[in-house]
A protein has these predicted regions:
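Acidic donor-binding/catalytic loop of UDP-sugar-dependent glycosyltransferases
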Residues: 70-84
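A short beta-strand-loop structural module common to alpha/beta enzyme folds
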Residues: 33-47
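Conserved catalytic core of nucleotide-sugar-dependent glycosyltransferases
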Residues: 80-162
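Short beta-strand-to-loop acidic/aromatic patch adjacent to the donor-nucleotide binding site
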Residues: 61-71
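Conserved glycosyltransferase catalytic-site signature
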Residues: 48-53, 144-147, 169-180
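Glycine-rich, basic loop-to-helix element that forms the pyrophosphate-binding segment
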Residues: 43-59
Length: 228
């Protein structure tokens, strides 16, 4: 049986600082980590693309890239993931099956609401309890949200797909760029239901770094890099 590798990058110096920052809703508090190889990259100052590429290897395993402020609340998540990977090459929790590429380049805006798939839980503003954001029924998608990305490591390695480290926005656009690159290589992307709580409600403002990442992404679209 192949191992499961759970990878996250955090600007926190260690797990204690991470848990102090996010409380119980963080990746290190996740359920059913027994037998899972947890790879936490602390004090991270590199782009997520650069970190993630080091884990795309020629090995028989399941790799999951997850945000540090995400808590896996589902005790059966590893089994659900294996089942989903029998159907899809890359699995996430939320995404969209069709997209019109335009600004602002956020998957849930570029993808019309009727094409949204999956669901994610979020922490209430008062930090007491959680609520569910239900995007739509589970299914195949064109774009996946980067909160949770899972795949058969060897299969992705053999496809030649990697994250594009040239993106100037270290924590943005890596997911939609990766999704479209996977599609151009004929890999199937889809969502599955795994109960995960995200400690963030998403992007709150368009920073200069985010704007530079958007320009980078739009240029790749213009140059025909994704075959869409």
């Amino acid at each position: 049986m192949s191992k499961t590798v759970l990878v996250f990058a955090s600007q926190s110096e260690n797990s204690a600082e991470l848990e102090n920052k996010y409380g119980k809703y963080c990746v290190t508090k996740s359920l059913n980590l027994d037998g899972v190889c947890v790879e936490g990259i602390y004090s991270n100052r590199q782009s997520l693309s650069k970190v993630y590429n080091t884990f795309i290897k020629d090995e028989n395993s399941i790799t999951v890239f997850i945000h540090d402020d995400a808590y896996i609340r589902d005790p059966d998540w590893t089994e659900k993931l294996k089942t989903a990977l029998d159907k899809y090459d890359v699995v996430g929790l939320a995404g969209g099956s069709e997209a019109k590429i335009n600004a602002p380049c956020l998957w849930h805006i570029m993808c019309p609401p009727h094409t949204h798939r999956g669901c994610v839980s979020h922490v209430n503003d008062d930090r007491k309890g959680t609520f569910v954001t239900n995007f739509g029924k589970q299914g195949r998608v064109l774009m996946l949200d980067g909160l949770f990305l899972a795949f058969n490591t060897k299969k992705l390695f053999d496809s030649g797909v990697k994250f594009d480290e040239s993106c100037p926005a270290g924590y943005h656009f890596y997911d939609i760029d990766f999704s479209l690159t996977c599609n151009s290589k004929k890999l199937k992307l889809g969502t599955t239901y795994i109960d995960v709580v995200h400690n963030s409600h998403g992007l709150r403002k368009f920073t200069d770094e985010w704007q530079s990442g958007q320009a980078w992404f739009m240029q790749k679209v213009t140059d025909g890099k994704y075959n869409i």
